[in-house]
């Protein structure tokens, strides 16, 4: 018997443990798609980012006057003015009016909120609460304004950490400042205008929701990346103690931002960022699988296994991940959603085909192929597989559930009219003849269920007929039983009567005999008495 390798995605601990057998599962249409590292997160703290939107330009020998900076400053003021006004309206009650609501001593301008949900009011409360820290950070505006560094850490008296970020300053430092003395003022002004214009266009696009109401519209991922620019990794490294890349954290939406203050004179924006606490479980892998139909026992079927499992060491669980955030390499969850698997399911995952359960398929709209690392895994018994380069039809034997097509067998593949280019070799070096019993196939599809229901209804009708017949038989048996009981009772009574009669006759016989004996004795005594009397007379 040929030995088949087993691929364990986790870490082997015991030699007898159960591992996921990727190769065997792929042969029955259960294909591994993605493996992610499991991490847990919670929103625990906040950090502040001071975004300086107007860059510093080093003075030049020819004292160039950059008109582009003046125009950029004017346009940026028009962009930030509505945001600043909205923040002031929310954080301050309307003048001359007593109609405002207080949350734990915090005054909120109700008119600025308008019709707001509970979550939006909570965001407004958070905005007002952040004003204290924002003002403390803004008090350091002179040191922030004077710096020429792209990322600058500042601390105020309470050791509140803030990070000053100048996304456009990084571009100025690396490109513009090195050329100030080597180019004419007009060329530099045009080049600076181009850079500032592009940055301004990007800000206008991503901050459009904040122009309506910054308290009710959190900063999007695009806005955060635009604000931070190329300094995103440095900011993430300064605020988070994790080895996960900044792109993964931002794409998962774990860092949420909110504008809490705008300083128009200095062109500074203070953004409150909710910083998560991230903990990675090193030996926990979440594996996504994709199921396609397979040809088993002369019919199209699909395996019944979960689409996503969690593997820790050599143990597996079902993992729905309904409340998790997924990226390409990580899955971030607030809690563990693992669900236990049955022993049969674990054995099936380990490659024991006899423990697997399949469901039959009725209908033509079904997943019958999947692309896997540059190859194609398809059910070529349920769709037309035609290789165009070289040109030949691909046949799938009866003992193969699916067919793996790689570069060695075909370069251009057509599946029911869809053309694919094969670019990789398959890493599967063996194929197993599958033997699956009929008892492993169940019906779960709607069309199959309707068919089975009709069969069940027919069986129920037959059962009702049989029940009626059995009731009739039971009724006849019941009447016969009553008659039999009466006869038995009569026989018993007759026997008892006969026994009583015999006993009475026997008693009468004994009594008569005793009476006769007594009479005999009496007569005998009388005779003796008479004889004695006669003797006395003589």
From Swiss-Prot:
Residues 128-156, 452-477 form a coiled coil. Its main location: virion. GO terms for biological process: fusion of virus membrane with host plasma membrane; symbiont entry into host cell. Disulfide bonds join 324-333, 348-356, 380-385, 387-410. It comes from the Viruses. The record marks 95 as: Determinant for fusogenicity and cleavage efficiency. The inactive precursor F0 is glycosylated and proteolytically cleaved into F1 and F2 to be functionally active. The cleavage is mediated by cellular proteases including host FURIN during the transport and maturation of the polypeptide. It is found in: Virion membrane; Host cell membrane. Glycans are attached at residues 56, 73, 89, 182, 352, 427, 433, 457. GO terms for cellular component: host cell plasma membrane; membrane; viral envelope; virion membrane. Residues 508-538 are cytoplasmic. Class I viral fusion protein. Under the current model, the protein has at least 3 conformational states: pre-fusion native state, pre-hairpin intermediate state, and post-fusion hairpin state. During viral and plasma cell membrane fusion, the heptad repeat (HR) regions assume a trimer-of-hairpins structure, positioning the fusion peptide in close proximity to the C-terminal region of the ectodomain. The formation of this structure appears to drive apposition and subsequent fusion of viral and plasma cell membranes. The 2 coiled coil regions form a stable six-helix bundle. This is Fusion glycoprotein F0. It comes from Mumps virus (strain SBL-1) (MuV).
